[in-house]
Swiss-Prot record:
Gene it is expressed from: gatC
Name of the top EC class for this enzyme: ligase
Subunit organization: Heterotrimer of A, B and C subunits.
Protein's UniProt keywords contain Ligase: yes
UniProt GO MF annotations: asparaginyl-tRNA synthase (glutamine-hydrolyzing) activity; ATP binding; glutaminyl-tRNA synthase (glutamine-hydrolyzing) activity
Alphabetic keyword roster: ATP-binding, Ligase, Nucleotide-binding, Protein biosynthesis
Organism: Hydrogenobaculum sp. (strain Y04AAS1)
The protein's name: Aspartyl/glutamyl-tRNA(Asn/Gln) amidotransferase subunit C
Family: Belongs to the GatC family.
Function: Allows the formation of correctly charged Asn-tRNA(Asn) or Gln-tRNA(Gln) through the transamidation of misacylated Asp-tRNA(Asn) or Glu-tRNA(Gln) in organisms which lack either or both of asparaginyl-tRNA or glutaminyl-tRNA synthetases. The reaction takes place in the presence of glutamine and ATP through an activated phospho-Asp-tRNA(Asn) or phospho-Glu-tRNA(Gln).
Pfam families found in the cross-reference section: GatC
Reactions mediated catalytically: L-glutamyl-tRNA(Gln) + L-glutamine + ATP + H2O = L-glutaminyl-tRNA(Gln) + L-glutamate + ADP + phosphate + H(+); L-aspartyl-tRNA(Asn) + L-glutamine + ATP + H2O = L-asparaginyl-tRNA(Asn) + L-glutamate + ADP + phosphate + 2 H(+)
Length: 94
């Protein structure tokens, strides 16, 4: 599939781009390559792709794991209180 220089100029105009003549030729070739690649993708059989696709996420077993120690977690906290991160108040009490 090819794209004409006029089509590239039209696309550039719609995109509010000003292209020089050598850029028109360059982008014409680039768009042609992209369209050829898209055509190749369209040729791929959908049945082969559907086998690899799953619309659900496999679940892992819910097993307890060791977590980080509170002291280590709060080492780099700018402010802490009662073993928790302290953050600035953003909601007025009234």
């Amino acid at each position: 599939m090819s794209i004409s220089k006029e089509e590239v100029i039209k696309i550039a105009k719609l995109s509010r781009l000003e292209l020089k003549e050598d850029e028109v030729e360059f982008f014409s070739a680039q768009i042609k390559n992209i369209l050829e690649f898209v055509n190749k993708l369209n040729e791929v059989k959908a049945e082969l792709l559907e086998e690899e696709y799953s619309d659900s996420t496999p679940l892992r077993k819910d097993e307890p794991e060791t977590s980080l120690e509170v002291d280590k977690v709060l080492l780099n906290a700018p402010a802490k209180r009662l073993n928790m991160f302290e953050v600035p108040k953003i909601v007025d009490a009234n």
